[in-house]
Design a protein with these regions (language model features):
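Feature for soluble, non-membrane regions of globular proteins
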Residues: 1-205
Length: 205
């Protein structure tokens, strides 16, 4: 069975300081993200065991667990590359033009994205996604890692609103953490994902 693996960070733990502390990055990557990878692999093994032994009553709970752990793994894998010590500034080119078209300007996009992150109740994410059916950008608020998703939306930029992403450094000032992330957002990575996502086609007819 193919195993999910924890990706290496594309920079040192302390590379995003002072915006995100090295200690947070070390714990976030090495403990929390690693836990989702381990959980996804373990759940796949339990699903295989349940099928083999015909314990199909176990399937619903295992499917929920897989959605949680695997979505956590995928979102964190995107998140690390959405950040860069050489980040910040503004998007450019077609990405910038499409953000302006779909949100009425970069300031409005930034305010909406921050509000979606800040208003997350409990644990969740803010995500900029490409919606291929209407060929437009949307911002979605994800509950935990896997709920309240727009089906078919391709995540381009994600922001972790779980307490483990910021509490050691920012305590209850999560809005300050969200603001700090704009200094390290990796717009070339977002643009690369945007160009790839625009090639997708959804046949809904």
């Amino acid at each position: 069975m193919n195993q999910y693996k924890l990706p290496d960070l594309p920079y040192d733990f302390g590379a995003l300081e002072p915006h995100v502390s090295g200690k947070i990055m070390e714990l976030h990557h090495g403990k929390h993200h690693a836990g989702y990878v381990k959980g996804a692999n373990a759940t796949l093994e339990r699903l295989d065991e349940a099928r083999t032994t015909e314990q199909f009553d176990r399937i619903p709970a295992l499917e929920r667990a897989l959605a949680f752990h695997l979505s956590g793994h995928i979102l964190h894998s995107i998140f690390w590359r959405n950040l860069s010590p050489r980040g910040g500034g503004e998007p450019a080119g077609e990405l910038k033009a499409t953000l302006e078209r779909d949100f009425g300007g970069l300031p409005a996009f930034k305010r909406q994205f921050n509000e979606v992150a800040a208003s997350t109740m409990g644990s969740g994410w803010a995500a900029l996604v490409w919606e291929p059916l209407s060929s437009r950008l949307l911002i979605t608020q994800i509950y935990d890692h896997q709920s309240n998703l727009n089906q078919g939306g391709v995540p381009l930029l994600v922001l972790d609103a779980w307490e483990h992403a910021y509490y050691l450094q920012y305590q209850n000032r999560k809005a300050d953490f969200f603001g700090a992330c704009w200094n390290v957002f990796n717009w070339p990575d977002v643009a690369r994902r945007f160009e790839a996502a625009r090639k997708l086609h959804v046949d809904a007819a």
